[in-house]
């Protein structure tokens, strides 16, 4: 079977189009395959953050995306991943703008101007947005948490919680705190499976404002750990940036978001009914085409596979190097 190794902002995945399989995978096999190929130590060619399964979508969409993390859990959405799936479906079906079915919503995606030569980009809708504790599976004694303390976590850092639709906990911090050990300490505790605040876990991001309209986001992703980038985290952080720092940025204005794996651009929108949604614009890089037997992938036998580089990764790295000059 063929898979694609892809990434958005360094957040890397394998794409597997289930329509191309000779034998359909059971639910158990979908999870096991993701766990085997994604393992950073024993997985396929260095592993990945997850597997993006592409399936036929329901009416009104041109495909469905399921996101299985490296630990076998399923994410409701993946902002970096959906851009790479958008590119795959765009090229497969010769479409420039269409909808992709995800767990909670059918999301608009469209081809965007490339970031540089051989660095194609896509624009993905990130929604729905909710601040309700029930949607976040959050227990802090409040219905919403916006720029407030959680004393059990820190007496010095204020947090905001938002689902987009996967849950995010966001804090605006200084550079020293951004790069320090607090993020790992707090996020590890909140994703240990038995804490009372987020019993199902949560994505945790620290955000530093670099200048008006430009932020840096560092994320500990639920089911993954520290990651180069998390698209929904960057979208959620952008939303909170607009809501909490309106003296610097506003709706319908482009925001540059830097992350350990690169950069994206975002824009926060507000519908007439008051609902928020975000545009997430960034690279959709295809690193390699992989061929491996279905049985070997499921069983974690990586002695016999082919790996054909596309050349796009070198172009992406050159683009990122130019950003940091």
UniProtKB/Swiss-Prot annotation:
Main location group: cytoplasm
Query: Which annotated residues bind substrate?
Result: 11, 69, 79-80, 166, 203, 221-222, 231-232
Q: Which SUPFAM superfamilies match?
A: Diaminopimelate epimerase-like (SSF54506)
Locations listed in the record: Cytoplasm
EC number of this enzyme: 5.1.1.7
Q: Which Pfam families match?
A: DAP_epimerase (PF01678)
Which residues make up the annotated site Could be important to modulate the pK values of the two catalytic cysteine residues?
Answer: 168, 221
Keyword Amino-acid biosynthesis part of the UniProt annotation = yes
Q: Quote the catalytic activity from the record.
A: (2S,6S)-2,6-diaminopimelate = meso-2,6-diaminopimelate
An example Gene Ontology cellular component term from the record? cytosol
Q: Which GO terms describe its biological process?
A: lysine biosynthetic process via diaminopimelate
Q: Which pathway? A: Amino-acid biosynthesis; L-lysine biosynthesis via DAP pathway; DL-2,6-diaminopimelate from LL-2,6-diaminopimelate: step 1/1
Where along the chain is the active site annotated? Answer: 78 (proton donor), 230 (proton acceptor)
Q: Which UniProt keywords apply?
A: Amino-acid biosynthesis, Cytoplasm, Isomerase, Lysine biosynthesis
For this UniProt entry, the molecular function terms from Gene Ontology, in alphabetical order, are: diaminopimelate epimerase activity
Question: What HAMAP family does the entry give?
Answer: DAP_epimerase
Please describe what this protein does: Catalyzes the stereoinversion of LL-2,6-diaminopimelate (L,L-DAP) to meso-diaminopimelate (meso-DAP), a precursor of L-lysine and an essential component of the bacterial peptidoglycan.
**Subunit structure comment from the entry:** Homodimer.
Please report which protein family the annotation says this sequence is part of.
Answer: Belongs to the diaminopimelate epimerase family.
Q: What is this protein called?
A: Diaminopimelate epimerase
- What organism is listed for this UniProt entry? Ligilactobacillus salivarius (strain UCC118) (Lactobacillus salivarius)
What is the primary gene name for this protein? dapF
């Amino acid at each position: 079977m063929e898979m694609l190794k892809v990434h958005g902002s360094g957040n890397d995945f394998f794409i597997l189009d289930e329509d191309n399989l000779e034998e359909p995978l059971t639910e158990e096999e979908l999870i096991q395959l993701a766990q085997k190929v994604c393992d950073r130590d024993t997985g396929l060619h260095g592993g990945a953050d997850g597997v993006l399964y592409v399936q036929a979508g329901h009416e009104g969409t041109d495909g469905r995306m399921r996101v299985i993390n490296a630990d076998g859990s399923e994410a409701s959405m993946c902002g970096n991943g959906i851009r790479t799936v958008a590119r795959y479906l765009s090229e497969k079906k010769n479409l420039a703008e269409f909808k992709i079915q995800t767990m909670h919503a059918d999301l608009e995606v469209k081809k965007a101007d490339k970031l540089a030569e051989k660095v194609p980009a896509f624009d993905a809708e990130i929604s729905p947005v909710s601040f309700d504790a029930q949607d976040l599976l959050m227990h802090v004694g409040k219905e919403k948490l916006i720029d407030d303390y959680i004393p059990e976590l820190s007496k010095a850092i204020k947090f905001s919680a938002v689902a987009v639709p996967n849950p995010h906990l966001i804090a605006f911090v200084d550079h020293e705190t951004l790069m320090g050990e607090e993020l790992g300490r707090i996020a590890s505790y909140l994703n240990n499976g038995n804490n009372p605040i987020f019993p199902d876990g949560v994505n945790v991001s620290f955000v530093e404002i670099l200048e008006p309209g430009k932020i840096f986001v560092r994320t500990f992703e639920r089911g993954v750990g520290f990651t180069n980038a998390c698209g929904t985290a960057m979208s959620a952080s952008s939303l909170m940036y607009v809501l909490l720092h309106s003296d610097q940025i506003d709706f319908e204005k482009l925001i540059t978001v830097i992350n350990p794996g690169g950069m994206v651009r975002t824009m926060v929108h507000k519908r007439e009914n008051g609902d928020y949604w975000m545009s997430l614009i960034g690279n959709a890089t295809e690193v390699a085409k992989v061929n491996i037997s279905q049985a070997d992938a499921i069983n974690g036998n990586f002695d016999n596979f082919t790996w054909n580089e596309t050349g796009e990764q070198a172009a992406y790295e050159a683009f990122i190097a130019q950003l940091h000059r």
